Amino acid sequence: MVRLTIDKYLDKRGITRYELAKRTEVKFQTIDRYYKNRVVRYDSYILDRICSVLECDLCDIIEYVNDKD
């Protein structure tokens, strides 16, 4: 399963969801879903905006977890 780790990344850098929404120009509700890992289909545009604003790689905010464990 793919899991977003935006929450950990933002908390570590002291950035709020509101600030990220404002800087990415993405609706707060959308950023909140990504933050809470409640996204069914990932939007490459949104992931690109998040990575661009945070100056990070995709692998910094997303991880693969083997759900067979």
Predicted feature locations:
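A short, Lys/Arg-rich alpha-helix, primarily the initiator
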Residues: M1-I15
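The alpha-helix within a helix-turn-helix
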Residues: L10, A21, C51
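DNA major-groove recognition helix of helix-turn-helix
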Residues: L10, Y35, Y42, I46, ...
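Short alpha-helical DNA-recognition segment
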Residues: I15-R33
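The DNA-recognition helices of helix-turn-helix-type DNA-binding domains
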Residues: K27, R38, V65-K68
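Short, charged recognition helix plus adjacent turn
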Residues: R33, I62-D69
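DNA major-groove recognition helix of helix-turn-helix/homeodomain DNA-binding modules
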Residues: Y45-D60
